[in-house]
């Protein structure tokens, strides 16, 4: 994320994932290793056991020291789940208005949409795409727009919303509306998770829309170079693995094949190993020094 999907204070981003691809672990890493003053976490619609496991194991004492956790498990009423979501945003806004840089994690925006769907259908709203009533599509942009930089440039809410791609379906209507409202997305790949490549971030499907404003032109060029090499290798992986690719046919693919072990090492990170922005960029510049 630091190197290929650089985030800025006040950015709103979606973490799009199916089940079992390392979403909760990545959220725990973001919470424990962030430089934010306060972390506000809303666990909406999760299983009660997962809430306890996230707090005790994934966050741990280190993560809890500067965190506020609001939990509304799946067994509570949809009204309470919506109230917990509003409280998560209100607490984040309170700290932002004090001039603090806040990291807000909302897990998950999809469960918030489900809660609003239950309420909307119960009061007689007509179902539209995948059974979601119109109030869902009005609620989500309003929530997302509550993040960002505070008045007069003091304080910020950097918001990360997890979005469940049901059945790994990236064309889900909640995914679509979130993409339209957010400043980028981090897509987690089941294929990478099956290969024990963690964090299982799919570079081809992920983007940070403010990254160009945060980096120097040279650093932005280096990041795009790695993205092109990764994409080129993935598109031709089958040919390479069966030995059908002839070296020298495509110079960029030749470079990708030569650098791929280093690229894979760069893109992986142990869940207990923090790495700051400067160390990430030193490693990336060294990897692509001659590119």
Describe the predicted segments one by one:
Residues 3-6, 10-291:
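P-loop NTPase catalytic core
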């Amino acid at each position: 994320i630091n190197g290929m999907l650089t985030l800025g204070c006040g950015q709103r981003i979606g973490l799009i994932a199916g089940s079992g691809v390392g979403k909760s672990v990545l959220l725990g890493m973001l919470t424990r290793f962030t430089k934010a003053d306060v972390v506000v976490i809303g666990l909406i619609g999760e299983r009660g056991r997962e809430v306890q496991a996230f707090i005790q194991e994934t966050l741990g004492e280190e993560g809890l020291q500067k965190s506020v956790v609001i939990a509304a498990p799946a067994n509570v009423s949809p009204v309470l789940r919506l109230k917990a979501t509003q409280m998560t945003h209100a607490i984040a806004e309170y700290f932002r208005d004090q001039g603090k840089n806040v990291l807000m994690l909302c897990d998950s925006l999809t469960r918030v949409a489900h809660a609003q769907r239950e309420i909307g259908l119960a009061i007689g709203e007509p179902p539209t795409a995948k059974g979601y009533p119109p109030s869902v599509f009005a609620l989500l942009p309003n929530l997302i727009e509550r993040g960002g930089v505070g008045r007069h440039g003091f304080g910020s809410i950097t918001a990360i919303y997890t979005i469940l791609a049901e059945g790994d379906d990236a064309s889900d209507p909640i995914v679509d509306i979130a993409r339209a409202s957010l400043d980028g997305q981090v897509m987690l790949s089941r294929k990478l998770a099956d290969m024990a490549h963690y964090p299982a971030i799919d570079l081809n499907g992920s983007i940070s829309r403010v990254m160009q404003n945060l980096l120097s032109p040279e650093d932005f060029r280096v990041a795009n170079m790695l993205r092109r090499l990764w994409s080129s290798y993935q598109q031709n992986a089958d040919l390479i693995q069966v030995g059908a690719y002839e070296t020298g046919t495509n110079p960029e693919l030749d470079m990708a094949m030569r650098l791929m072990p280093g690229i894979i090492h760069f893109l992986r990170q142990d869940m207990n190993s923090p790495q700051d922005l400067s160390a990430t960029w030193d490693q990336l510049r060294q990897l692509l020094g001659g590119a």
